[in-house]
């Protein structure tokens, strides 16, 4: 079977957005996982920013990974991927001009789509880690991203955190990003269908949700009727890989009979050492939780 080009995969992603169905992403974090996901029939994969930070730096999701490091990983995946890959480009690695550079590099890497979020990243001195940038700045980033892409089939998705805003504020932000030309709107932190319905009735572009398995949003048909086309449940495949590596190496060392049996989440927490970063952020930056 002939190999799909990067543009073929971008068109395939746009077909997902234009469909009447809801699709769940596969967590793809290296070339092998991308091939496995495609072979198993997943329609779309996602390279998460948090997963890239774990894979490249063994560091928590504190905006520590650089653009070049993220692009390198996306490029490795793009060489072999035969499913559309959506890149979680965090905040675009800086201001609107940095966003333009991010789009240029990720387009060359072969991703089918990318998200740009309006979280204030990296964390700023004396600010909360969940603070958002002004909506006007977010609009500027989306407009800059659209200007920077060469291949118009590359989807630019605006992302915001519904978990730290009122429903009215979410509507204002998402409508602003829609008006700026975003191909879709991504939201994290939507609580339930009632809130989603209130937001969705004000939007016409396709929606993407990061739910992390929220049980209040587990109804694909209902999600699809509200315009949701892409759902990110989390990155279970990556954490399963961490767990499998730990268990295999533990067995090789003859430690399989020990009572310790850490979960994937506990292992990730142990080996990324987030307490150190939290302490440093408080000590050197007065960053609030």
Swiss-Prot record:
Mg(2+) binds at residue 88. It is an enzyme of class 4 (lyase). Its EC number is 4.1.1.112. Belongs to the isocitrate lyase/PEP mutase superfamily. Oxaloacetate decarboxylase family. It catalyses: oxaloacetate + H(+) = pyruvate + CO2. Pfam families: PEP_mutase. This is Oxaloacetate decarboxylase. Catalyzes the decarboxylation of oxaloacetate into pyruvate. Seems to play a role in maintaining cellular concentrations of bicarbonate and pyruvate. One of its GO terms (molecular function) is magnesium ion binding. The keyword Metal-binding applies. One of its GO terms (biological process) is pyruvate biosynthetic process. Keywords: Decarboxylase, Lyase, Magnesium, Metal-binding. Binds 1 Mg(2+) ion per subunit. InterPro entries: ICL/PEPM, Oxaloacetate_deCOase_bac, Pyrv/PenolPyrv_kinase-like_dom, Pyrv_kinase-like_dom_sf. Its cofactor is Mg(2+). It comes from the Bacteria. Substrate binds at residues 50, 159, 235. The keyword Transit peptide does not apply. Homotetramer; dimer of dimers.
């Amino acid at each position: 079977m002939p190999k799909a080009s990067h543009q073929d995969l971008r068109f395939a992603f746009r077909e997902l957005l234009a469909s009447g169905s809801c699709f769940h992403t596969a967590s793809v974090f290296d070339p092998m996982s991308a091939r496995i996901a495609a072979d198993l029939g997943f329609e779309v994969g996602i390279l998460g920013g948090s997963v890239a930070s774990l894979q490249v730096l063994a560091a928590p999701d504190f905006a520590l990974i650089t653009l070049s490091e993220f692009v390198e990983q996306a490029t490795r995946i793009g060489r072999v991927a035969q499913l559309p890959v959506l890149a979680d480009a965090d905040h675009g690695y800086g201001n609107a001009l940095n966003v333009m550079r991010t789009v240029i590099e990720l387009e060359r890497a072969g991703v089918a789509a990318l998200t740009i979020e309006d979280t204030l990243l990296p964390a700023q001195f004396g600010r909360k880690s969940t603070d958002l940038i002004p909506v006007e700045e977010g609009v500027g980033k989306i407009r800059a991203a659209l200007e920077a892409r060469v291949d118009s089939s590359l989807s630019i998705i605006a992302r915001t955190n519904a978990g730290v805003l009122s429903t009215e504020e979410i509507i204002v932000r998402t409508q602003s990003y829609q008006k700026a030309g975003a191909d879709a709107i991504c939201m994290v932190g939507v609580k339930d269908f009632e809130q989603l319905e209130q937001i969705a009735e004000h939007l016409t572009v396709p929606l993407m949700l990061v739910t992390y398995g929220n049980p209040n949003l587990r109804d694909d048909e209902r999600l699809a009727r509200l315009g949701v086309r892409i759902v990110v449940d989390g990155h279970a495949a990556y954490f399963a890989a961490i767990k499998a590596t730990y268990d295999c190496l533990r067995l090789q060392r003859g430690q399989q009979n020990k009572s310790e049996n850490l979960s994937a989440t506990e292992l990730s927490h142990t080996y990324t050492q987030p307490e150190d970063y939290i302490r440093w952020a408080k000590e050197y930056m007065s960053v609030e939780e």
